[in-house]
Amino acid sequence: MVCLKLPGGSYMAKLTVTLMVLSSPLALAGDTRPRFLQQDKYECHFFNGTERVRFLHRDIYNQEEDLRFDSDVGEYRAVTELGRPDAEYWNSQKDFLEDRRAAVDTYCRHNYGVGESFTVQRRVEPKVTVYPARTQTLQHHNLLVCSVNGFYPGSIEVRWFRNSQEEKAGVVSTGLIQNGDWTFQTLVMLETVPRSGEVYTCQVEHPSVTSPLTVEWRAQSESAQSKMLSGVGGFVLGLLFLGAGLFIYFKNQKGHSGLHPTGLVS
């Protein structure tokens, strides 16, 4: 059984329920009055595991932070004038303030222990593919795309090499994109003018693998590509004919074995 703790106890539960009710479609139906949004964000910042932990409580009103508790400071501080009365009030509540200071252990370190196995220690190996953005590849400006998908955690390093020499100029990236299933993807592109015989390599380093993943793309002329495709097509066609021939052969053999020899009955 997984038990996640929330700071604030029943106060937080009541606040969460209230916000959910106020933001529901039924509550907003037919209401044309100005709406106000109150948010409470609780953040845990971990450094080197749980060796050093920082707890933050941020009070946000209409997308503007007005009040903050920082465990490194030990008390509430007003970010705007709107938050000053609340800061003075909460700092006067000694028991409540001690609970906030203890949240580093009771909230952050506790939940770290609960979720470490499926968050911090989780590893999913990336899938890497390389392809040109345009079909006309040689002697023209092109983008070579290195697609890295389905990996976790998000820390990753992608490099481009041309003929074993790292390429740094002309490299652009989409940055990390969340897939929505606890995995990430990214596209790292190299702007270049491919020439026949050149070998481009996308190298990916990620915590899920012990050694870098590499995928090559070789620049080939259209005639070379046509010859290669013709060779592949001929090979596949040969396999089909071979399979058909073997099928007919074994079928005939089975038919012959089922025939009984005829002779005179004495």
Curated annotation (Swiss-Prot):
Residues 30-124 are annotated as: Beta-1. Changing R100A: In allele DRB5*01:06, allele DRB5*01:11, allele DRB5*02:02, allele DRB5*02:03 and allele DRB5*02:04; requires 2 nucleotide substitutions. Ubiquitinated by MARCH1 and MARCH8 at Lys-254 leading to down-regulation of MHC class II. Glycans are attached at N48. GO terms for biological process: adaptive immune response; antigen processing and presentation of exogenous peptide antigen via MHC class II; peptide antigen assembly with MHC class II protein complex; positive regulation of immune response; positive regulation of T cell activation. GO terms for molecular function: MHC class II protein complex binding; peptide antigen binding. Residues 30-227 are extracellular. Residues 1-29 form the signal peptide. Disulfide bonds join C44-C108, C146-C202. It is found in: Cell membrane; Endoplasmic reticulum membrane; Golgi apparatus, trans-Golgi network membrane; Endosome membrane. Gene3D superfamilies: Class II Histocompatibility Antigen, M Beta Chain, Chain B, domain 1, Immunoglobulins. Changing G115V: In allele DRB5*01:06, allele DRB5*02:02, allele DRB5*02:04 and allele DRB5*02:05. Heterodimer of an alpha and a beta subunit; also referred as MHC class II molecule. In the endoplasmic reticulum (ER) it forms a heterononamer; 3 MHC class II molecules bind to a CD74 homotrimer (also known as invariant chain or HLA class II histocompatibility antigen gamma chain). In the endosomal/lysosomal system; CD74 undergoes sequential degradation by various proteases; leaving a small fragment termed CLIP on each MHC class II molecule. MHC class II molecule interacts with HLA_DM, and HLA_DO in B-cells, in order to release CLIP and facilitate the binding of antigenic peptides. Binds peptides derived from antigens that access the endocytic route of antigen presenting cells (APC) and presents them on the cell surface for recognition by the CD4 T-cells. The peptide binding cleft accommodates peptides of 10-30 residues. The peptides presented by MHC class II molecules are generated mostly by degradation of proteins that access the endocytic route, where they are processed by lysosomal proteases and other hydrolases. PANTHER family: HLA CLASS II HISTOCOMPATIBILITY ANTIGEN, DR BETA 5 CHAIN, MHC CLASS II-RELATED. This is HLA class II histocompatibility antigen, DR beta 5 chain. It comes from Homo sapiens (Human).
